[in-house]
Amino acid sequence: MEPQATEIVTPLSTCSAPRGRVRWILIFWMFVISAIAYLDRVNIAIAGHSIAQEFGLDNIRLGWVFSAFVFGYALFQAPGGRLADRFGPRKILTIGTIWWAVFTSLTALVSAGVAHALLTLIAVRFALGVGEAVVYPSSNRLVAAWIPTQERGLANGLIFSGVGAGAGMAPPLITFILVQYGWRWAFWISALMGLVVGALWYLLARDKPEEHSWVKPAELAHIKAGLPQSQVQKPLAWGTIFGSKNVLAISLSYFCYGYVAYIFFAWFFIYLSNVRGLDLKSSSYYGMLPFIAMAICSPLGGWVSDVLGKRFGKRIARCGIAAASILLSAVFLAMGPVAHDARIASIVLAGGAGALYLSQSAFWSVTSDIAGRSAGSVSGVMNMGNQMGGVVTASLTPFLAKHFGWGVPFYVAAAISVVGALAWLAVDPSKNLTNED
């Protein structure tokens, strides 16, 4: 049984924290974990050219390596969410960070000279995906317990701005390490960062606000008053989750979202260097732009959602913002490939990434709103759809580019974005999930 926070003596538990802000300290630390997780995820895209040369891989086989991570990540979303619901985000996220640090290190240890080197690399990346699968279902379980409904847009936006921050700092940081020390060191340093944030998370976090010694009565009352009164107390059955129109519609939209997002995570750096002809240094700087846009637009979209929610309700605040943002992303994606200048194309496509991330918090806020204590499980199912979109784009993008040119993958992504926006028309964020549904 998890001990009460007052019984745990650590250096952190004896410190003072700003009164009434403990929930935001945990959200900030989820931002940090999110950033490191995405740094660990996209470092292989930056080092992809060096790895491909050493292992003798073309873009198709390199796409298999990219897909292996996403496939493992996708398959374990729902189980990871259920684990977070059952054992709490504190323990599960700590185990996850240790797991992914180990397999990030093993990526660097794979040698091109061993038998079945490609299969070994694929297996290691698959296992890394399994470890990272617990991150966002765990964060959503934390949000469901710690964050009042009216603050969830901003909270989720801040957490997912870590995606842009981590992926944005990856190009210059990984490029510097790669040039100075070789690609393997990029993975060892990334692994060390994961271990550090995981250890600090275990010391700092608690699963519930009433378990944390820093939480004052006023903050606890504020949190409890803002939680949905009809939150589900018993775990939702899998049949209830998979049979929900809300969950299916959100998962479809998040599949489309993931398809688009993974073009930036897996292929954008390679697109700038190999297709647009930018040198390594320029590619690293312009490759940051989509992720900077993500880091800015994710909390911005969440904040706008919270503001609109107070005046117009959740349907406009969540569904309207998400649909409009994803449609705007489609416009930028269609315009980017026709820009003749590589730098202009980078800026336009970065606008598409930013517009996409204006919708990010809506997905996670709706799932925490409708699922209560099963928020980890429901968001895990939703995020499985997102990652399956990533599986498709990791392999389909180089295929389309090879046979039809590099403009086509972006046009296909724009069309898929339209489908993702339309799916939000079927979502009712005011309808809570129950096992009687």
Residues covered by each model-derived region:
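Central cavity-lining transmembrane alpha-helices of secondary-active solute carriers
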Residues: 67-82, 288-301
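Hydrophobic core of transmembrane alpha-helices in multi-pass small-molecule transporters
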Residues: 103, 117-134, 332, 343-358
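Cytoplasmic helix-loop-helix junction between adjacent transmembrane helices
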Residues: 124-164
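Helix-loop-helix hairpin linking two adjacent transmembrane segments in secondary transporters
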Residues: 163-212
